[in-house]
Amino acid sequence: MPARRPFIGGNFKCNGSLDFIKSHVASIASYKIPESVDVVVAPSFVHLSTAIAANTSKCLKIAAQNVYLEGNGAWTGETSVEMLLDMGLSHVIIGHSERRRIMGETNEQSAKKAKRALDKGMTVIFCTGETLDERKANNTMEVNIAQLEALKKEIGESKKLWENVVIAYEPVWSIGTGVVATPEQAEEVHVGLRKWFAEKVCAEGAQHIRIIYGGSANGSNCEKLGQCPNIDGFLVGGASLKPEFTTMIDILAKTRA
């Protein structure tokens, strides 16, 4: 099995002030980030410029939390891929469960956003996940695969585009609840997603695509989760706003060394 480069992303969501973002990003950037790990943080849109200015590390990338599915135009309140690129951003989170569940974003809309970003050369952190009711109904894989099928419909089997996709499995019932999926539960889904990729996209590529876990991941549980062979890192919410985020970076680097 080829070694997949570990990936950890910090999703700041709708949190922080200008002063906090400046100091927090500067603190992460000043930390000795292992060169073996890809590290990104995603502040809100209004904090992007502050985060970019505070980032002094070549090992830390700044990401956007969302993007619109069209280019520049009459889309009040939206942000285009072109605008993100103009700021020098290389990464964007797409399809987060809060976008899907609260904002009503559909599988098709998430997929179209991802295609536009990928076509322009960005790396997409593409989120999938099931609700508690869907898990109880034994529809976990069906729901997650449907979200990936929508992406496949947009980008096909293009190796060039899929190479810039990081899949983030985030069980909705675990996000912000403090209820984390067990390593066994998370690994089972990651195995299923990798199997789908091997069968529907590319068998060889399935061994290379990174699938990370998101859902109340923190400094206390990331080591056991990271020991699972198919979990390649984390998309971190609340813990990314705390000093423990750098601890998680180190733990991931050592666990996946």
Swiss-Prot record:
Catalyzed reactions per annotation: D-glyceraldehyde 3-phosphate = dihydroxyacetone phosphate
GO BP terms: gluconeogenesis; glyceraldehyde-3-phosphate biosynthetic process; glycerol catabolic process; glycolytic process
Q: Which PROSITE patterns match?
A: TIM_1, TIM_2
Residues that, per the record, bind substrate: 11, 13
Q: Which domain of life is it from?
A: Eukaryota
Q: Which residues form the active site?
A: 96, 170
Keywords of the record: Gluconeogenesis, Glycolysis, Isomerase
Which InterPro entries has this protein been placed in? Aldolase_TIM, TIM_sf, TrioseP_Isoase_bac/euk, Triosephosphate_isomerase, Triosephosphate_isomerase_AS
The Enzyme Commission number assigned here is: 5.3.1.1
Family designation? Belongs to the triosephosphate isomerase family.
Q: What is this protein called?
A: Triosephosphate isomerase
> Which species is this record about?
Giardia intestinalis (Giardia lamblia)
Q: Provide the taxonomic classification.
A: Eukaryota, Metamonada, Diplomonadida, Hexamitidae, Giardiinae
